[in-house]
Amino acid sequence: MQRHMLKSKIHRAAVTHCELHYEGSCAIDEDLLEASGIIENERIDIWNINNGERFSTYAIKGERGSGMISLNGSAARRAQLGDLVIIAAFAMVDEAELQAGWKPKLVFMDDGNKIKGHRDHVPTQNWT
């Protein structure tokens, strides 16, 4: 059996560009792509923290070191500059890979769209 698992996540990145008339996609700083394990043309889900919008598109490379998160084409209508988003990719993972210790790549952003941390799991949510 295979399970549809979270593979990659870029958490709380700020939208830096919205290019309505660019061919669809989301341009992501190449450093962030590498850190998260997302590759060019991979399907991604984007969740806008500010307005609750959730949509899918595909990743393209943005300028390395720029902090770029550019929503292009119709996706540009789903966010404003500065909105915080979560970018996620999923994978089909078989039971043997899971039992062998398969883990997702999670990247956490600071206020300047620079990486402030990495994790390989989502912590247990507690009531506090």
UniProtKB/Swiss-Prot annotation:
Its cofactor is pyruvate. One of its GO terms (biological process) is pantothenate biosynthetic process. Keywords: Autocatalytic cleavage, Cytoplasm, Decarboxylase, Lyase, Pantothenate biosynthesis, Pyruvate, Schiff base, Zymogen. It catalyses: L-aspartate + H(+) = beta-alanine + CO2. The active site is at S25 (schiff-base intermediate with substrate), Y58 (proton donor). It is an enzyme of class 4 (lyase). Is synthesized initially as an inactive proenzyme, which is activated by self-cleavage at a specific serine bond to produce a beta-subunit with a hydroxyl group at its C-terminus and an alpha-subunit with a pyruvoyl group at its N-terminus. Its EC number is 4.1.1.11. InterPro entries: Asp_de-COase-like_dom_sf, Asp_decarbox. GO terms for molecular function: aspartate 1-decarboxylase activity. The modification Pyruvic acid (Ser) is found at S25. HAMAP family: PanD (MF_00446). PANTHER family: ASPARTATE 1-DECARBOXYLASE (PTHR21012:SF0). This is Aspartate 1-decarboxylase.
